[in-house]
UniProtKB/Swiss-Prot annotation:
Belongs to the RBM8A family. GO terms for cellular component: catalytic step 2 spliceosome; cytoplasm; exon-exon junction complex; NLS-dependent protein nuclear import complex; nucleus. This is RNA-binding protein 8A. The gene is tsu. It comes from the Eukaryota. Heterodimer (via RRM domain) with mago. Part of the mRNA splicing-dependent exon junction complex (EJC) complex; the core complex contains btz/CASC3, eIF4AIII, mago and tsu/RBM8A. Interacts with Pym (via N-terminus); the interaction is direct. Interacts with eIF4AIII. GO terms for biological process: establishment of pole plasm mRNA localization; germarium-derived oocyte fate determination; import into nucleus; microtubule cytoskeleton organization; mRNA splicing, via spliceosome; mRNA transport; oocyte anterior/posterior axis specification; oocyte dorsal/ventral axis specification. The RNA recognition motif (RRM) is involved in the interaction with mago. The RNA-binding activity of such domains is therefore uncertain. Residues 26-47 are annotated as: Disordered.
Length: 165
């Protein structure tokens, strides 16, 4: 035979007298969180921007310019002679501070340099000195260009702010 539900003994079932009020109380206590890390505090966003860029000495406003990488301050050196080796680059750049890392890409087919290198310094001061002194210098008879590898561009103006002007 089929199973039958006995409805006559309604005393066995408890009735929730609060009803939906318990659910409403739970929802009120729950916090609404957005995004990664659940941070909605604007102070964290400002702290990140102050870490990534260099402060202008004239004022407290952050200006666009070099951006620090995770490891240090990296310079992008271009127009390197194809037969240049890491030793020649290190010899040229070591006068301005301790070099943490030099990366010189080589073409796999020819074994020659691809024409650029990444030179990493620990401090901004060392990297800036090397950039200013060696931009336009010569390595193996070829003029090189030195610039920052990571640069934070100028502040973007939102479309809504452009309309107000």
């Amino acid at each position: 035979m089929a199973d039958v539900l006995d409805i006559d003994n309604a005393e066995e079932f408890e009735v929730d007298e609060d009803g939906d009020q318990g659910i409403v109380r739970l929802k009120e206590k729950a916090k609404h969180r957005k995004g990664r890390g659940f941070g909605s505090d604007s102070n964290t966003r400002e702290a990140i921007h102050s870490y990534e860029r260099v402060r202008n000495e004239d004022d407290d406003e952050l200006e666009p310019g070099p951006q620090r990488s995770v490891e240090g301050w990296i310079l992008f050196v271009t127009s390197i002679h194809e037969e240049a080796q890491e030793d020649e680059i290190q010899e040229k750049f070591c006068d301005y501070g301790e070099i943490k890392n030099i990366h010189l890409n080589l073409d796999r087919r020819t074994g020659f340099s691809k024409g650029y290198a990444l030179v990493e310094y620990e401090t901004h001061k060392q990297a800036l000195a090397a950039k200013e002194a060696l931009n336009g210098a010569e390595i193996m008879g070829q003029t090189i260009q030195v610039d920052w590898c990571f640069v934070k561009g100028p502040k973007r103006v939102k479309k809504s702010e452009k309309r107000r002007r």
